[in-house]
């Protein structure tokens, strides 16, 4: 973990060639080549999980104002953040068009055309697109932006409430798989009524604890009930010939998944990337002298082919610069495994390996076991990154029994668990008094007799309170 996280995060995005924030619109950044590769492998992981029981689609970017305005609660939640297109060339449009802030109001009019019968259900589509929100707070690349460039949204329709509830649990399991693969620990809460997705019956949310103690919302899942089905007339004919409204869910992930993987695993030397999303999982660094140069380079190429045959992503850094600069660069960029090979190593049939999480030299034989030994090192690194992150996460959730303790613990960089009655007025009062956010319900209290931290009423839940991004 890094100490001055805000400064570190800003610097590492630039130094590691992830994004460039100098684009002349606030809150919009350029994905640079190395960052774009990280993004590509992250979206590949998301697609691998969602392609199992969803189909990928792609909807237009523009949403007619009339469609956006149909669902009152929904548009109220986004109306201050919408970008509007008012002209086509020099001609003023008859109807304003919104750059999608999210896609419910563009997707669901089409669902009303596509769903006719119970045999059309369940309908499960997802897309990975860019969305736009006029963010007025302090923007931060990948965390708080005006253009979300990697927005995965899944939208499902079902014949019954029970099926929609089951789908919410399936979304939760999908997200757990994605976050677990990346070694990102999380809290899962049911968002309070005042903070749920506009138009939803309820919202479940995943939050990661960043190195500065703030929480970052990294995934949300919404049970929409029949709210949007009523608005957009999404009905089906059941087996008995009766027309009924569908039940719906939606679920979203964004660039924040990448931000959390970068932030949670990084250290003072730079990135420590989970192997799943590292552009290169192995970097081979030839140590070259005039004598034996060709033999070393030939062996590096041979090793590269062997690793690639095993499904690994490999590069050879044969730039004409000092080895020390190469070591520095790949530590900064977080490549999981670095292999050094020089004439003496080749003579001794050895190579020097180094795991990015430990930075200790490991001597390996250049034999038939090399590939399996390196794969073992990658697996050990992956496991260690996850365990270290989990330990930090667990250590930074503390219980408080009074409001003063809540403030103190959060200022010390923790997320705080409290007993809560569940009343909306009480929850909003907690936020007002502390200046921090009630993330939501962490778990239900099974034993009676415990009192709410504020109202002194019987507590029903354990809630989490945090400083948030």
Swiss-Prot record:
MF-aspect GO terms:
ATP binding; proline-tRNA ligase activity
Q: Which InterPro entries match?
A: aa-tRNA-synt_IIb, aa-tRNA-synth_II, aa-tRNA-synth_II/BPL/LPL, Anticodon-bd, Anticodon-bd_dom_sf, Pro-tRNA-ligase_IIa, Pro-tRNA-ligase_IIa_arc-type, Pro-tRNA_ligase_II_C
Q: What is its EC number?
A: 6.1.1.15
User: PROSITE patterns per the record?
Assistant: AA_TRNA_LIGASE_II (PS50862)
Catalytic activity line of the entry? tRNA(Pro) + L-proline + ATP = L-prolyl-tRNA(Pro) + AMP + diphosphate
Name the UniProt key words of this record, in alphabetical order.
Aminoacyl-tRNA synthetase, ATP-binding, Cytoplasm, Ligase, Nucleotide-binding, Protein biosynthesis
Q: From the record, what ranges are coiled-coil?
A: none
Looking up CDD domains in the UniProt record yields: ProRS_anticodon_zinc, ProRS_core_arch_euk
Q: Where in the cell? A: Cytoplasm
Q: Name one GO biological process term.
A: prolyl-tRNA aminoacylation
First-listed, main subcellular location of the protein, grouped into a coarse class: cytoplasm
Q: Describe its function.
A: Catalyzes the attachment of proline to tRNA(Pro) in a two-step reaction: proline is first activated by ATP to form Pro-AMP and then transferred to the acceptor end of tRNA(Pro).
Q: How does it assemble?
A: Homodimer.
Which family, according to the similarity comment? Belongs to the class-II aminoacyl-tRNA synthetase family. ProS type 3 subfamily.
Which PANTHER family does the UniProt record give?
Answer: BIFUNCTIONAL GLUTAMATE_PROLINE--TRNA LIGASE, PROLYL-TRNA SYNTHETASE
The molecule here is called Proline--tRNA ligase
Q: Which organism is it from?
A: Methanobrevibacter smithii (strain ATCC 35061 / DSM 861 / OCM 144 / PS)
């Amino acid at each position: 973990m890094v100490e001055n996280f805000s400064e570190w995060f800003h610097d590492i995005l630039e130094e590691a060639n992830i994004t460039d924030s100098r684009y002349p619109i606030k809150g919009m950044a350029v994905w640079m080549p190395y960052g774009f590769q990280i993004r590509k492998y992250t979206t590949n992981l998301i697609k691998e999980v969602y392609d199992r029981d969803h189909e990928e689609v792609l909807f237009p970017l523009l949403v007619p104002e009339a469609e956006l305005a149909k669902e009152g609660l929904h548009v109220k939640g986004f109306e201050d953040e919408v970008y509007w297109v008012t002209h086509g060339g020099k001609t003023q449009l008859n109807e304003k068009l919104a750059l999608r802030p999210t896609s419910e109001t563009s997707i669901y009019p089409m669902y009303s055309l596509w769903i006719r019968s119970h045999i059309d259900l369940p309908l499960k589509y997802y897309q990975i697109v860019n969305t736009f929100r006029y963010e007025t707070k302090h923007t931060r690349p990948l965390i708080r932006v005006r253009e979300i460039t990697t927005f995965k949204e899944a939208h499902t329709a079902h014949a019954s409430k029970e099926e929609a509830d089951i789908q919410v649990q399936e979304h939760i399991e999908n997200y757990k798989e994605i976050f677990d693969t990346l070694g990102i620990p999380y809290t899962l809460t049911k968002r309070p009524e005042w903070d749920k997705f506009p138009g939803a019956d309820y919202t479940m949310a995943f939050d990661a604890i960043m190195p500065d103690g703030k929480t970052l919302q990294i995934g949300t899942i919404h049970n929409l009930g029949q709210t949007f089905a009523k608005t957009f007339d999404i009905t089906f004919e059941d087996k008995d010939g009766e027309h009924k409204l569908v039940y719906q869910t939606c679920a979203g992930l964004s660039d924040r998944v990448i931000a959390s993987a970068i932030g949670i695993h990084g250290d003072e030397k730079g990135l420590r990337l989970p192997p799943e999303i590292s552009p290169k999982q192995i970097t081979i660094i030839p140590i070259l002298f005039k004598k034996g140069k060709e033999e070393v380079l030939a062996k590096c190429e041979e090793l590269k082919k062997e690793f690639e045959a095993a499904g690994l992503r490999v590069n050879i850094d044969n730039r004409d610069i000092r080895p020390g600069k190469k070591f520095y660069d790949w530590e900064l960029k977080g490549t999981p495994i670095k292999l050094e090979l020089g004439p003496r190593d080749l003579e001794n049939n050895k190579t020097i390996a180094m795991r990015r999480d430990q930075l200790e030299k490991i001597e390996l034989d250049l034999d038939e076991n090399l590939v399996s030994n390196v794969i073992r090192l990658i697996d050990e690194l992956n496991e260690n990154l996850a365990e270290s992150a989990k330990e930090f996460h667990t250590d930074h959730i503390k219980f408080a029994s009074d409001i003063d303790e809540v403030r103190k613990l959060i200022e010390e960089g923790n997320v705080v668990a409290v007993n809560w009655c569940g009343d909306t007025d009480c929850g909003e009062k907690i936020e007002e008094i502390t200046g921090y956010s009630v993330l939501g319900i962490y778990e239900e209290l099974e034993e009676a007799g415990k009192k709410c931290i504020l109202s002194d009423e019987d507590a029903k839940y354990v809630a989490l309170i945090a400083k948030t991004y």
